[in-house]
């Protein structure tokens, strides 16, 4: 990799299956000898950023993503807060990366979600990676937000 005094930060957005486009960006950067010095992501971008920050190559992440079946990654629930639970997404993360903490990633990482009560941005830089990604992938009205933030408000990706 080329030595450069500048640090490349990369923010990866959401978009469900479109989130796999981020893998092409990561691969292209690698081909140019560039490696992000910081990663940030939300929703599908949070998943891609997390796997990369914990050492997976873009092609390996693509193979892992193929194993995620959204209908199996969610559980139906009967609640006025949402139709599905995304607990299985947390289990999916832990299956491939273990019960890791965000701060233990090899590349500094931030996972972005929103407080469903206020709409304010919530940035996770420490704590359980699986929990942060569950918050980041939670869509209001679709997923029941079982995660409660420090002030007891549920988290969401919107």
Language model features: what each stretch is:
Residues 1-42, 50-158:
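Patatin-like phospholipase
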């Amino acid at each position: 990799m080329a030595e450069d005094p500048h640090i490349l930060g990369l923010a990866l957005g959401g978009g469900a299956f479109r989130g796999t486009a981020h893998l092409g960006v990561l691969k292209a950067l690698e081909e140019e000898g560039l490696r992000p010095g910081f990663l940030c992501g939300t929703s599908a971008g949070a998943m891609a950023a997390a796997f990369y920050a914990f050492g997976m190559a873009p092609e390996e992440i693509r193979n892992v993503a193929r194993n995620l079946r959204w209908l199996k990654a969610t559980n139906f629930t009967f609640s006025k807060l949402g139709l599905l639970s995304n607990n299985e997404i947390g289990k999916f993360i832990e299956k491939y990366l273990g019960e890791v903490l965000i701060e233990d990633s090899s590349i500094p990482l931030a996972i972005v979600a929103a407080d469903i009560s206020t709409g304010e941005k919530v940035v996770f830089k420490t704590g359980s990676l699986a929990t942060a990604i569950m918050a980041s992938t939670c869509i209001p009205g679709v997923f029941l937000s079982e995660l409660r933030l420090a002030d007891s408000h549920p988290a969401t990706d919107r």
